[in-house]
């Protein structure tokens, strides 16, 4: 389990709070302007025709609101939503039970859809295309296949790893939306809205202080808001100002770039112990006492995305941004250009 404060993965507390503060309509949805405008058009058009919305794939890094957008789609269409995840649907019968209980135009939301098994995918193809499923009745020589008609429905799939989707499944989605990391202004608006729903007192500088350290991720912003709330109630008068938020973040070891202690240890190890790299992952793991898998899957992605770390064929390297962030001078690169005036071979005499 990942217990980092700035992890984008959801905890039990996150899920409970998210349900309470989740926007219900596109008008309440902050950020992702292109996605919001496109979905507004698609939803209104489908509603106007009295049809189910096209099957929709939502992908992007964790914590950006894929589940929230699925709920909004169902609310905007005025239908119910059934929610499940790829690993849960391990048998075709599990999927068939869900599909046959849907009402016309309902939304079936499948999180981690890239983890569907091949046999379940085979059942899903005719369901998505023809709104029919084939079910086997009986066993052995007496077994026979029957077709069941399904009501028109919308499959909304969410994934953090769109590249792992099979081509036949990906091609059956009529709408594909990618969620991008949020800018500080949008995150500040999300923090302000969440604080209002949680009855917290906060000013603009407090919102910006939290938003700037949230790594572009609403889930992290809301988690930091709750921890700053705790600090404000115990160490201040309950109001979250810029100064209070800054003091809380310093206590929590989250700096202005959203780095925590693990991020700083990794970058400093590469710069101070390995002259900025390149250095192999196993050497880094030994230097900071962390598991290779944790570094690769948990710590590195954000540092690479933000331009502080590079993966090269020879290993990891700290970028110029990393040296500047810590106020360190990068080592001088050796000059490998040839010297035209030294060690030149003797010129023979002309005859």
Curated annotation (Swiss-Prot):
GO MF: ATP binding; ATP hydrolysis activity; four-way junction DNA binding; four-way junction helicase activity
GO terms for biological process?
DNA recombination; DNA repair
Q: Which positions bind Mg(2+)?
A: 67
Q: Which EC number(s) does the record attach to this protein?
A: 3.6.4.-
Tell me what reaction this enzyme catalyses.
ATP + H2O = ADP + phosphate + H(+)
Query: How would you summarize the oligomeric state and partners of this protein?
Result: Homohexamer. Forms an RuvA(8)-RuvB(12)-Holliday junction (HJ) complex. HJ DNA is sandwiched between 2 RuvA tetramers; dsDNA enters through RuvA and exits via RuvB. An RuvB hexamer assembles on each DNA strand where it exits the tetramer. Each RuvB hexamer is contacted by two RuvA subunits (via domain III) on 2 adjacent RuvB subunits; this complex drives branch migration. In the full resolvosome a probable DNA-RuvA(4)-RuvB(12)-RuvC(2) complex forms which resolves the HJ.
What is said about the domains? Has 3 domains, the large (RuvB-L) and small ATPase (RuvB-S) domains and the C-terminal head (RuvB-H) domain. The head domain binds DNA, while the ATPase domains jointly bind ATP, ADP or are empty depending on the state of the subunit in the translocation cycle. During a single DNA translocation step the structure of each domain remains the same, but their relative positions change.
Task: Provide the protein name.
Answer: Holliday junction branch migration complex subunit RuvB
Q: Which organism is it from?
A: Alkalilimnicola ehrlichii (strain ATCC BAA-1101 / DSM 17681 / MLHE-1)
